[in-house]
Amino acid sequence: MRLLSLLFLLFVTAALPAQQKTIHFTNGQWFNGSSFTAGEFYSVNGYLTKSKPAVVDTIVDLKNQFVIPPFGEAHNHSPETDQDLDVYIERYLSDGIFYIKNPNSIPFATNKIAHRLNKLNSVDVLFANGGITANGGHPSTLYPYLLTTTYKKALPGWTAKSFEGEAYYLINSKEELEKKWPYILAQKPGFIKFYLIFSEEYKERKDDTAFNGKKGIDPGLAGIIVKKAHAAGLKVSAHAETPNDLKVALLAGVDEINHLPGYQVRWRGGYTADYYKLDKNIVRLFKKKRVHVDPTYSLLKTELKPVTNEQYKAQVNVQTYNLQLLRKYKVPVTIGCDSYNLTAKTEMEYLQSLNVYSNLELLKMWCEVTPAAIFPNRKITKLQEGYEASFLVLPNNPLEKFDQVYNINLRVKQGLLLW
């Protein structure tokens, strides 16, 4: 099935100009933000309209199936290189994911694949380029390993030193920030990302190599980075690991939080799951600042598994507690899995299993909140007049059986019938 989908995708690429026609979509059950309404739409020049155009090229009978906006992926590190690019594109589209946010990427690599992205027959991606961290900070220590795995074939000739200034920027002071900022902007990032990791222990960890990979920037730089980014018209995402990291980031004025405390527990460092519990003051700050967060809680099952069952249960309890607080205070949650090889489908399946949110809330997170967080200036989150004619068609009502979101019968992107 994957192969057939990929062959179809390649066929669509070749036939693209002829495929974007004026289409009349009839007999659909269209998601209106709270329920489904029977109706019809036309796709004209890639946008939805109720007004009948002079010429209709094609009529598509949706046969009373359920229509929802496409999904977003708030945190992923693919696509990034040309290695297996077709596979990644097909995987996202197959899962109904049209919009992707990559919060740490390599511009040397992404520039080479830019012509393959943000097209009608592909996925739309926003890249942060390299993240801002400090000497010995995450993710700088991760790349020597990735050079032997993920990037082994994709970046021939690269060494561990090649990643500095591409995958990350080492900034330890305000002076270094001022010096490197023009270069960061010259790389044309789609947004800015910086790393806070145990900011409450910054001074103790700063020069201790035992904490390499387990530290981030000086928390005192957070507000300065945000101010400079906003002045340049760029939004800011912050990697946060602890409740204090959240507080620092929120007070600094970031627009988005990557990770919610509890996605990882540093058991070997002597920390317990309860260390990552949020309090009401921080969650109220979330609401006040109108900041959204991508929990990436599925990492507990995919990459950051605890050693014992007791640890696993304790971490799940903290995750559930934190999400219940976010829900109580109506903090917007986006969906992303922080992976190179998985998609947001993994995160959604995991969040669903925690039974914190209703089917309606989960659906809106994935097809409204997440796409809006990636491309806030595009009309992609509703099925209304003047919005992009991009949507997914499901055989049954996902508000009744949520697993229907994984059972997609048709994908349409800006009026282009994919498959």
Model region roles, listed by residue range:
Residues 71, 86-207, 214-234, 281-302, ...:
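Divalent-metal coordination cores built from histidine and acidic residues
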Residues 82-85, 139, 203-205, 246-254, ...:
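Histidine/acidic-residue-rich catalytic or RNA/ligand-binding cores of hydrolases
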Residues 69-80, 229, 236-243, 257:
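Histidine-centered catalytic micro-motifs
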Residues 315-397:
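His/Asp/Glu-enriched, well-ordered alpha-helical/loop segment
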Residues 3-14:
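Sec-dependent N-terminal signal peptides
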Residues 1, 16-54, 396-401, 416-417:
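N-terminal metal-binding scaffold of metallo-dependent hydrolase/deaminase domains
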